[in-house]
Amino acid sequence: DVEISGMKFNPEELWINSGDMVIFTNKDMVVHDVTQDPGKEWTSKPIPVDSSWKKVFTLSEDYLCSIHPIMKGKIKVR
């Protein structure tokens, strides 16, 4: 799973198996989202502080926070 804190996704790169669900939990002081990059083919709703969002991944994908685009991460599927 991925924790959002300190204006970063932690870990920035997460290895999973195809079909695994990843939970993104916002432990930062501000709202964030999780958006596929590039292309924005999928995006979460804004994730409030102390809330989470889940997604099942079948392919490796890069993502960012569209609110704070300097924040980037990768899901790597084995």
Write out the residue ranges for each language-model feature:
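Extracytoplasmic copper-binding redox domains, predominantly the cupredoxin/blue-copper superfamily
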Residues: D1-R78
